[in-house]
From Swiss-Prot:
It comes from the Eukaryota. Keywords: Acetylation, Leucine-rich repeat, Repeat. This is Ras suppressor protein 1. LRR repeats lie at residues 41-63, 64-85, 87-109, 110-133, 135-156, 158-179, 181-202. Potentially plays a role in the Ras signal transduction pathway. Capable of suppressing v-Ras transformation in vitro. One of its GO terms (cellular component) is focal adhesion. PANTHER family: PTHR48051, RAS SUPPRESSOR PROTEIN 1 (PTHR48051:SF1). The keyword Acetylation applies. Residues 1-24, 250-277 are annotated as: Disordered. Signal peptide: none annotated.
Amino acid sequence: MSKSLKKLVEESREKNQPEVDMSDRGISNMLDVNGLFTLSHITQLVLSHNKLTMVPPNIAELKNLEVLNFFNNQIEELPTQISSLQKLKHLNLGMNRLNTLPRGFGSLPALEVLDLTYNNLSENSLPGNFFYLTTLRALYLSDNDFEILPPDIGKLTKLQILSLRDNDLISLPKEIGELTQLKELHIQGNRLTVLPPELGNLDLTGQKQVFKAENNPWVTPIADQFQLGVSHVFEYIRSETYKYLYGRHMQANPEPPKKNNDKSKKISRKPLAAKNR
C-alpha cells in the first residue's frame, strides 16, 4: 500500500499532475505519506475515507490547492495554517469529529463550497471571522449541534445553497432574509416553531428552488400552510397578520421545544453516506 502511495507522489511530481487521489487507503497520518507536502503544484487532493485524526500545519505548503477533500475521516481539529490556502475553492470536511474550527478560518478568500456536514459543531464552534467567507456559494452544516444560527449569516450574500438539516435550531435570524441569491434552503429536522417574516424576502417557491422544512414542531398556523404547499407558507409569512403574530410570539419568549437527544437518526445515516462522495 505504501509503495502505491509513494508511486502516486512520484508520478504527480514527474508528470506535473495537478490532481492526487488518495481516498480509501487506510492513511492515519498525512506525514506518513513521504513527499506529499513537496507537491506544491497540485490543485486537488482527495483524502476521503481514510483514518486521519488531524491535519498537520504542513498543509500550508500545498499553496496551489483549489479542492481539498477530507470527507469521512476522524479529524478532531484543524491547524490555523489551513487558512493560508489562498486559492482553495472547495473544502469538504463532512463526516469527521470537529467540535471547533481554528482561529482565522474565515480568511480563505476564494472559498466557494464548504461542507461541514456530520460533525459536532455548534454556534460556539465558529471563530469570530467565520462569516468573512463572503465568496461562499454553498454552506453545508447539516447533522451538527447548532441551536442558533448567528445573525452574521446575512453577510454571506452570495450563498445559493444553505443546508441546516438535523441540527437543534430553535429559531432562524431575520438576517436570513438578506440571502437574496439563495436557491436551496434545508431546515428539516430541527426544533423550529416559527419562521422570521424576513424569510419572505426570498424566492424559494419556484420550480428550480428547493425549500425543505419537514419534521419541525411548527405552530398551528404555519403547519396548516405547509399542508397547502410551500407557496402558501411564503404567502402567509409575508402577510401583515403573520408579522403581528410573529412579533407577539417572540415577545412572549415561549419555552423552546425539548431537545431531541436521540441522535440515532444521525448515526444510522453514517454507513449509508460513507461511500457516496
